[in-house]
């Protein structure tokens, strides 16, 4: 069992969901180094070995020497991501700055400009009132999606959705879905709601109207967590808009944790082939003992009206120490009728 991926999720799921919704992207971690009464630092180092056997690789044709048999296998070994988070709290004011470095060639994270990069992943300040209302301003990720940002937000190594529409379905993947905006949130004992007025990073707000994301979380039923919301895409040309509906639920029975998610993309006529797309995920995670656990995930997402991406993943995980965890993942993938197998070994150190 990965301490920071499973035990914290099962014991503190309610608090985490409320915090995520209310603050829209606060960094989660198993521990933090306290610098003084107001400032703490946490982060992680994540690396992996990956092996892919997929007939789609031979279709690329750019990595196989002329005259050689087309290769359908690929492998990589390296440092995936390093993150350092500075968290400030003083009375009603809190703030987070997340510095992120990653190798997007090794992680395959869908970035437009792949390669080694170091950047400010998140930077936001929050002002909280005594009545449960809070205001967050800055750069942050979406509050939608069951799977969250960074290794701590996943029960597996890989993300559920893939193919050409992966970035649209992996809502919580902050490396590809980050915005700049203002969130107004309200948090009560059993529920929270939030409205984020936002634009994509580095987009001029004068070019189109602000996008709007409405999110919610409900924890009023014992051992049950409900969440989701709706993203309203407001562009200058409505034919280019993609609205997003997200619903997810989770529950636990002793050592067994279950979750399910549904996502629907309503696309304008000029987006792809103009068809609406949907995807789903079902996850089961079982703690065998205090150190060993296993996750099973089944997921599917449409890439266009005639092509689907389907994935079955099994991921045993082991807590080597309180701060060092390992995952061995095996996935069977069908990408538009092309079959493939993926294997990964991941090590993550948190501090």
Model-based region annotation:
Residues 41-45, 95-97, 135, 193-195, ...:
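Transmembrane beta-strands of outer-membrane beta-barrel proteins
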Residues 83-85, 123-126, 183-185, 215-217, ...:
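Outer-membrane beta-barrel architecture
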Residues 188-192, 207-209, 214-305:
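Detector for outer-membrane/organellar transmembrane beta-barrel domains
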Residues 33-57, 66-200, 208-210, 217-223, ...:
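Outer membrane beta-barrel
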Residues 46-50, 100-102, 140-142, 196-200, ...:
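Outer-membrane beta-barrel pore domains and translocons
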Residues 318-320, 339-351:
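Outer-membrane beta-barrel "beta-signal"
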Residues 2-33:
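Gram-negative bacterial Sec-dependent N-terminal signal peptides
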């Amino acid at each position: 069992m990965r301490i920071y991926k499973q035990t914290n999720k099962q014991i503190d799921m309610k608090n985490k969901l409320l915090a995520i919704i209310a603050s829209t992207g606060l960094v989660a971690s198993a521990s933090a180094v306290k610098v003084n009464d107001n400032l703490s630092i946490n982060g992680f180092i994540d690396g992996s070995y990956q092996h892919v056997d997929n007939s789609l690789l031979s279709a690329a044709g750019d990595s196989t020497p002329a005259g050689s048999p087309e290769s359908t296998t690929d492998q990589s070994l390296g440092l995936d991501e390093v993150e350092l988070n500075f968290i400030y709290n003083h009375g009603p004011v809190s703030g987070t700055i997340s510095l992120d470095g990653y190798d997007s060639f090794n992680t395959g994270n869908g970035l437009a400009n792949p390669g080694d990069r170091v950047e400010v992943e998140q930077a936001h300040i929050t002002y909280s009132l005594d009545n449960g209302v809070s205001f967050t301003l800055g750069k942050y990720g979406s509050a939608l999606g069951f799977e969250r940002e960074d290794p701590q937000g996943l029960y597996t190594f890989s993300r559920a959705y893939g193919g050409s529409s992966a970035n649209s379905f992996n809502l919580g993947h902050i490396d590809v879905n980050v915005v700049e905006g203002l969130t107004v949130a309200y948090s009560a004992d059993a529920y929270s709601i939030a409205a984020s007025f936002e634009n994509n990073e580095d987009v001029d707000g004068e070019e189109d109207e602000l996008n709007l994301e409405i999110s919610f979380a409900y924890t009023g039923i014992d051992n049950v967590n409900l969440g989701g919301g709706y993203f309203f895409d407001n562009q200058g040309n409505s034919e280019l808009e993609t609205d997003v509906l997200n619903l997810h639920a989770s529950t636990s029975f002793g050592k067994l944790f279950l979750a399910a998610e549904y996502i629907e993309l309503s696309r304008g006529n000029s987006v792809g082939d103009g068809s609406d797309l949907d995807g789903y995920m079902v996850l089961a995670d079982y703690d065998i003992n205090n150190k060993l656990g296993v996750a099973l995930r089944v997921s599917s997402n449409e890439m266009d009206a005639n092509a689907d991406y389907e994935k079955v993943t099994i991921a045993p995980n082991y807590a080597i120490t309180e701060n060092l965890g390992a995952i061995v993942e095996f996935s069977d993938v069908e990408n538009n009728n092309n079959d493939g197998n993926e294997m990964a070994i991941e090590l993550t150190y948190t501090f």
